[in-house]
Amino acid sequence: MITPVPQHNSLEGTPLEPAISSLWSTAKRIDTRVVRGRITRAVGTLIHAVLPEARIGELCLLQDTRTGLSLEAEVIGLLDNGVLLTPIGGLAGLSSRAEVVSTGRMREVPIGPDLLGRVIDSRCRPLDGKGEVKTTEVRPLHGRAPNPMTRRMVERPFPLGVRALDGLLTCGEGQRIGIYGEPGGGKSTLISQIVKGAAADVVIVALIGERGREVREFVERHLGEEGLRRAIVVVETSDRSATERAQCAPMATALAEYFREQGLRVALLLDSLTRFCRAMREIGLAAGEPPTRRGFPPSVFAALPGLLERAGLGERGSITAFYTVLVEGDGTGDPIAEESRGILDGHIVLSRALAARSHFPAIDVLQSRSRVMDAVVSETHRKAASFFRDLLARYAECEFLINVGEYKQGGDPLTDRAVASIGELKEFLRQSEDEVSDFEETVGWMSRLTS
């Protein structure tokens, strides 16, 4: 009788054994099958396809072997007899012969420190002619917001170099604030000032649905070579597909999260939140969602908090975020303006009337508010800002009488002081685009005006 020779594992009992066992266990779970499907319908910005085992958010390739066409698409819905895909890009050249190939991957963002100083699109492709973009890792496009119980509280001011903001609407490090204004209300001017003056280590700018002319103008004139060194600009112009425009905002946020995890102070400027929501509306309506307020489907209002809550303070670094919102008039009835105000930590309201009088930045101080200001400024600063606002309010109440020559001095001492000092108050609030004001000097000037 022959006795079997026992198999001896040469790694047994060595330090490598646990690692090898873990790798072997993982390898056995890997599915190496390539799942393929076919297109059944393609209309507008939506593709119907048969694709077994597809998941919401999964990336697929649309491939036509005869023409060599290869397009990326994302699964956005599941049907009884197939899936809904939205292409990342246009549908030009797509035919009924194209195969749908599952990649098994969700949307990811290539990231690395070498992205600083670059202008890229939402898929990390270079737009600045500086060659290939070098990245070191990837992370999910749709990250999770920090745990509310581990998120640090906003306790320090975040100087912006803009007197009206630093003095009267002081922002805190890690705050999220909306900038609300009509077209032509001075949003670009204010964004330019914030980019230049923000006390940040890294600046991330997302330009969503902008005109192509304005993108180059912003990068070269407003940001400049010096500002671009610490910045990354993510661009999807108005001619790009809804999927690309919708991807721009979470892409910029993912970049900001990467630098926050390095312990850095990040300023995130997203222009505009309205155009992001419009792109989401295009996708949602094409997928058959019911229109609700102003034609926006429910998925838009679900996506907003998921995007906005990702900014703020982390365990180490911070993302101080500014989101522009396009409104008509005072924004009453605008669902995006109303929804975002309920989520964000403050709002800056821009006045077209001030912009028409060449009063820049065109901030309507009395209609604006920073919800964290009291937590990040001294009592002296808070009192000076409160009195400054009182003077502006008193002048606003009697401005009509002054203009028609009916105002009479002596009725109220505070109103008389407001009228006498309005020139100095406006001088404080006005600031040229290239001027960056020191935070302490701003507070000192405001204190002298209100003493």
Curated annotation (Swiss-Prot):
Residues binding ATP, per UniProt: 184-189
Keywords for the protein's UniProt record, in alphabetical order: ATP-binding, Cytoplasm, Nucleotide-binding, Plasmid, Protein transport, Translocase, Transport, Virulence
GO cellular component entries: cytoplasm; type III protein secretion system complex
UniProt catalytic activity: ATP + H2O + cellular proteinSide 1 = ADP + phosphate + cellular proteinSide 2
GO biological process, one term: protein secretion by the type III secretion system
SMART domains: AAA
InterPro entries: AAA+_ATPase, ATPase_a/bsu_AS, ATPase_alpha/beta_chains, ATPase_F1/V1/A1_a/bsu_N, ATPase_F1/V1/A1_a/bsu_nucl-bd, ATPase_T3SS_FliI/YscN, ATPase_T3SS_SctN, P-loop_NTPase
PANTHER family named in the record: ATP SYNTHASE, SPI-1 TYPE 3 SECRETION SYSTEM ATPASE
Cited function: ATPase component of the type III secretion system (T3SS), also called injectisome, which is used to inject bacterial effector proteins into eukaryotic host cells. Acts as a molecular motor to provide the energy that is required for the export of proteins. Required for type III secretion apparatus (T3SA) formation, proper protein secretion, host cell invasion and virulence. May play a critical role in T3SS substrate recognition, disassembly of the effector/chaperone complex and unfolding of the effector in an ATP-dependent manner prior to secretion.
Protein name: Type 3 secretion system ATPase
Designated gene of the protein: sctN
